[in-house]
Amino acid sequence: MAKINTQHSYPGMHGLSVRTTDEDIERIENGFIRTHSLCEDTSSELQRVISMEGRHLSGSQTSPFTGRGAMARLSRFVVSLRSWATRHLHHEDQRPDSFLERIRGPELVEVSSRQSNIRSFLGIREQPGGVNGPWPLARFNVNFSNNTNEDKKEEKKEVKEEKKEEKKEEKKEEKKDDKKDDKKDDKKDDKKKEEQKKEVFVIDPSSNMYYNWLTIIAAPVFYNWCMLICRACFDELQIDHIKLWLFLDYCSDIIYVFDMFVRFRTGFLEQGLLVKDEKKLRDHYTQTVQFKLDVLSLLPTDLAYLKLGLNYPELRFNRLLRIARLFEFFDRTETRTNYPNMFRIGNLVLYILIIIHWNACIYFAISKVIGFGTDSWVYPNVSIPEYGRLSRKYIYSLYWSTLTLTTIGETPPPVKDEEYLFVVIDFLVGVLIFATIVGNVGSMISNMNASRAEFQAKVDSIKQYMHFRKVTKDLEARVIKWFDYLWTNKKTVDEKEVLKNLPDKLKAEIAINVHLDTLKKVRIFQDCEAGLLIELVLKLKPTVFSPGDYICKKGDIGREMYIIKEGKLAVVADDGITQFVVLSDGSYFGEISILNIKGSKSGNRRTANIRSIGYSDLFCLSKDDLMEALTEYPEAKKALEEKGRQILMKDNLIDEEAAKAGADPKDLEEKIDRLETALDTLQTRFARLLAEYSSSQQKVKQRLARVETRVKKYGSGSLSVGEPEPEKPEEQKKD
């Protein structure tokens, strides 16, 4: 430990003498000594400062705290004591938070003892990254303005360096964040890729592709249902064409296998969307009964051929379990065909033939088991050449099956018990199945003739009416011809009746598909809004005119406009014979008269006679329907009126003075009518309110009367709020 010898002669001529070695000073400054006590730290610190001052004043007899620079030395001594006092304070490690660093500014960094002492004395905060070099004591005199300027410059440099470092750190953090974002994006992309991988190829059950596959799979199913029973019962058929049957059998098996893959990829709707997840598709199919039947239909029962031989096609009867595919094909075809009634009849006939075919094969098999020709019921003896042929065997069995199931004609009676049992079952099956089939056929035929019967009923009622009213023969003939034209050209369909079960959206789409192109041909509707055109399309009504019919006559009030769909119309003179112009498909007329354009010289009246040359199909749009549609489109109404006004001005058919004069008297009349209707509604509402008011007044009067009676009986005290009514005497209660 350093020893301190001081002479207490301050402020005398003798200075403080310190005896210590250089090694001790280095150990004290660098901290490579044992743990000191508080007194030892104080002594070593004082010795270090005083020795440094003693070196500068060596050879001088004056006191270190007197003379030139005394104040600076004294201040350094005081600062060294303060720095020593704060040396052992515990400094917390700061959080590596860039946000907090930006908020609270640059940090304070520990520097060498001399620099910290001097700067604390001057009140200067040093930023981190400062220069930790030695501070010459000679610079510190009374006038230390130069030192402060240099400190400020150094501080500015340090601040700049810190800002650069902060920017570098921020860039590094941004790079890290970008890398994290890139990793997140990569993860999202990987998830999307995984989802895309999950979405496998799916067949929409309502698509043409699925229907085409049903057509393919229906062929082997129908083959198995027709040929397996026939080959099992007629041995000659199986033996003579064994190679053909093997080829067809295994081709059908291959199609069966592919059909299972198709079922695994057949989508289904979940919440209105087609499911494309492989696992869901697989679970949806495997949980159905049809999956079990499909698996059973593919069991390799053909392996028994290796032991029993190839003459046992009944081993393949499990292939018949795919019958659901055949029914599904028939259902899809029925919804797609344009002739559903004809298809239903053909489908029922096919079912009848299959039932008769199976019954015939079973009859021949029973005859073979009992013995050919053993009695009159079984098939005759095959040893007879006439009955030994394969074609005769099948046709005879088919004939017997048809007679038995339809109960038409007589068949040989059964002899043995098993024969009786088989005939009884045949009769029951025939009665049940054929009663159902014949009933369905009858209803289908009646449905096919329903439209004709309904139309004929209308014609008959018109004939009876004309006969009752004694209509002329010429007019009656024209009416009958008009009905014949409607029937032959299939124009008897009431579109509203047919489309009434469809939603409004589909009705609009059908109407747009049928009538929109025709409506766009009209000049005033060419630039209209799409919504208005759709409204008008739904209001178009088809009409048919006979030869010689007048569509409109000159001077008639125009309440409709017409668009020619098919046929020819002629603009004729007053005599009805002279033709001025012939109008054909796509032409239109009467569009100006339904707009009520102010100043029109013709008003709303027709300006020409138009007559049908032959049968003509026209679309009619009434004025009321147009105005009803235009109520929701006021701007479109103004545009239509402006277009109509321009057309009239081109043809010099508008009176500009009348248009500028004001409203048309007819328009005023219409407004007056509307005001009258509004006034009527207001009067009814006022009468209702008046009745309610009078009833409420009566109730108030009744309540006031009751209050007055109570006041008279019990006095004013009974009217106090919250006070109960006085009890009535017992005599009054009895009364």
Swiss-Prot record:
3',5'-cyclic GMP binds at residues 532-654. Signal peptide: none annotated. GO terms for biological process: monoatomic cation transmembrane transport; visual perception. The chain crosses the membrane at residues 215-236, 247-267, 293-311, 317-335, 343-366, 390-424, 425-449. Its main location: membrane. GO terms for cellular component: intracellular cyclic nucleotide activated cation channel complex; plasma membrane. It is found in: Membrane. It is a multi-pass membrane protein. Residues 149-191, 725-735 have a biased composition (Basic and acidic residues). Residues 142-191, 715-735 are annotated as: Disordered. Pfam families: CLZ, cNMP_binding, Ion_trans. Keywords: cAMP, cAMP-binding, Ion channel, Ion transport, Ligand-gated ion channel, Membrane, Nucleotide-binding, Sensory transduction, Transmembrane, Transmembrane helix, Transport, Vision. The keyword Transmembrane applies. The keyword DNA damage does not apply. Residues 237-246, 312-316, 367-389 are extracellular. GO terms for molecular function: cAMP binding; cGMP binding; intracellularly cAMP-activated cation channel activity; intracellularly cGMP-activated cation channel activity; protein-containing complex binding. InterPro entries: CLZ_dom, CNG_cation_channel, cNMP-bd_CS, cNMP-bd_dom, cNMP-bd_dom_sf, Ion_trans_dom, RmlC-like_jellyroll. Residues 1-214, 268-292, 336-342, 450-735 are cytoplasmic. CDD domains: CAP_ED. Belongs to the cyclic nucleotide-gated cation channel (TC 1.A.1.5) family. PANTHER family: CYCLIC NUCLEOTIDE-GATED CATION CHANNEL ALPHA-3, CYCLIC NUCLEOTIDE-GATED CATION CHANNEL SUBUNIT A. Visual signal transduction is mediated by a G-protein coupled cascade using cGMP as second messenger. This protein can be activated by cyclic GMP which leads to an opening of the cation channel and thereby causing a depolarization of cone photoreceptors. This is Cyclic nucleotide-gated channel cone photoreceptor subunit alpha. It comes from Gallus gallus (Chicken).
